[in-house]
Amino acid sequence: MENSSLTLDDFLSRFQLLRPQVNGETLNRRQAAVLIPVVRRARPGLLLTQRSARLRKHAGQVAFPGGAVDSSDASLIAAALREAQEEVAIPPESVEVIGVLPPVDSVTGFQVTPVVGIIPPNLHYHASEDEVASVFEMPLSEALRLGRYHPLDIYRRGDSHRVWLSWYEHYFVWGMTAGIIRELALQIGVRP
C-alpha cells in the first residue's frame, strides 16, 4: 500500500478490514495500555508526547500517552483513556476507540496494549508538567512509512531483541513507540 496520500477514510477502512487478532492472554505480566491518538483530519496526524526529563524511567523519550493499569480501571481501554487525560488532557469522551493492536512486551516487565482511537482536530492539549515535556503531531502518512525505521539488534542479559529507530523533526522515535507505529503500519497493509 502506498501511504503518501493516506486519508482518514483509507486508514479507518484498512484498520477495520484487517482487524488484528488479539488473544487476550496476559501471561501473568503487569498490564499497561497506551492510546494511539489519530487526529481526525482529511490528512490525519498521529499525536505523540516527549516524556519529561525528570522522570525516573524513559526520561526524554518519545511515547504515546499511557501507563500501568490501575485497580480503578474497568479495562485496558479505560486505562489508556485515563492516562491520555492525565498526561495530555484528552477527554475520554472525545476519543472514538476503533480497536486495539496485539499487546507488546516491554523490557520493564509490562505487557502493553496499544489502543487505537480517533480524536478531534480542535482539542487543546495540555501537557502534564510532571510527566510530559512536549506534545507534537506527526503526519500519519509519514509515521506509517516503513522505510523511515531502521533496525538495531540489542543484546541484554544474554537475550537479543530488535528495536526500531527513526527521527521526526528533532524528535528521536525509537524502541517500543517505533515498534508500535510499525505494527500499526503493517496492520493496515503497508509493505516494506
UniProtKB/Swiss-Prot annotation:
Q: Which UniProt keywords apply?
A: Hydrolase, Magnesium, Manganese, Metal-binding
Organism equals: Citrobacter koseri (strain ATCC BAA-895 / CDC 4225-83 / SGSC4696)
Q: Gene3D superfamilies attached here?
A: Nucleoside Triphosphate Pyrophosphohydrolase (3.90.79.10)
Cofactor(s) this protein cannot do without: Mn(2+); Mg(2+)
Q: What does this protein do?
A: Probably mediates the hydrolysis of some nucleoside diphosphate derivatives.
Q: Where does Mg(2+) bind?
A: E83, E87
Residue interval(s) of motif Nudix box: 67-89
Protein EC: 3.6.1.-
Q: Which residues form the Nudix hydrolase domain?
A: 29-160
How is this protein named in the record?
A: Uncharacterized Nudix hydrolase NudL
Source taxon at top rank: Bacteria
As for family, the record states: Belongs to the Nudix hydrolase family. PCD1 subfamily.
Q: Which residues form the signal peptide?
A: none
